[in-house]
Amino acid sequence: MSEALLEIRDLNMHFPIKGGVFQKTKKHVKAVNGVNLTVNKGETLGIVGESGCGKSTLARTIIGLQKPTSGDILFEGKSILHYSHKEMHQLRRNIQMVYQDPYTSLNPRMKAGDIIGAPLKAYRMTNNLERRVKELMDLVGLKADDYYKLPHQFSGGQRQRIGIARAIALNPKLLILDEPVSALDVSVQAQVINLLEDLQKELNLTYVFIAHDLSVIKHTADIVGVMYLGKVMEISDSESFYNDARHPYTNALLSAIPLPDPKKEKMRERIVLSGELPSPANPPTGCVFHTRCPFAQEYCKTNTPILEAKDGNDGHLVSCFYPINIEKKQLISE
């Protein structure tokens, strides 16, 4: 049986909106709203969704950059929300993050070797520092001569490799990958994803891989979850997710992925969502997706669905009153 490394229990991250002369709180932005997730050791959990769905806020909350409004985060079975500063300092040896923009996440005045070695210095692991840094550089596909170069002398893909080398310097157990390839060219994306897969096998890493493109994590994630307005809409193992997605939002995202066969692409019917993503400061009542859902009923406007198994598949959870089944998919394609 797989052992849970990270557990997220009913996590909420609400940001107050203040206004008026006395700056009183008028409402809250529910960036993360009742999220429950489990990541087992050695697995990759993929989190996808549109911009503003709360996935990056979730990442920052997991790593401790912001304290949640309520809920709990467990790492190796222990709650980390009330850790002291010293305990958090030790925890960050085991949880590291790779950021979206490979340029702004690097100090432009520091040499690549110093950037990669910074975590080692912070934890006073300075014995044979230069040799260790060059080993890390070799591990991510950088040359030893790159040690003395500045970030602007590298390509986008190389800069992201520097960020990855820095993240694995302390031999962490969990990496939070916050859209690590979204700022890169498609050809470079594949190289970086292959690197991450190789590192996971070699170093026994566990990933939380955040992306806005389902095609990016199709071949890397063991478990895939979709977020919308701070909530998890659907989550399952990768095979079930891509072959038997049940939530209308998930199916809309999947139908937006181009097919390699032009004939099949031309014949395929897409699920087109109407309207724009509502404001998280003023989410719709009932099911938060009902304003854009092509299958929404009156019941959806006043009642909130829960994330639960459908048709007896305990590993496939859907937050929808009227999930898409095989018959409905056939009607869509006709």
Regions found by a protein language model. Name each.
Residues 128-145, 254-255:
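Conserved ABC ATPase "signature" region
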Residues 71-79, 91:
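Conserved ABC transporter NBD signature motif
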Residues 169-173:
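A short, proline-enriched helix->beta-strand linker immediately N-terminal to the Walker B motif
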Residues 150-154, 158:
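Conserved ABC ATPase signature
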Residues 4, 18-23, 237-334:
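Short catalytic/signature loops enriched in Gly
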Residues 184, 188-266:
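P-loop NTP-binding/switch modules centered on Walker-like glycine-rich loops
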Residues 63:
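Helix-to-loop junction immediately C-terminal to a conserved catalytic motif
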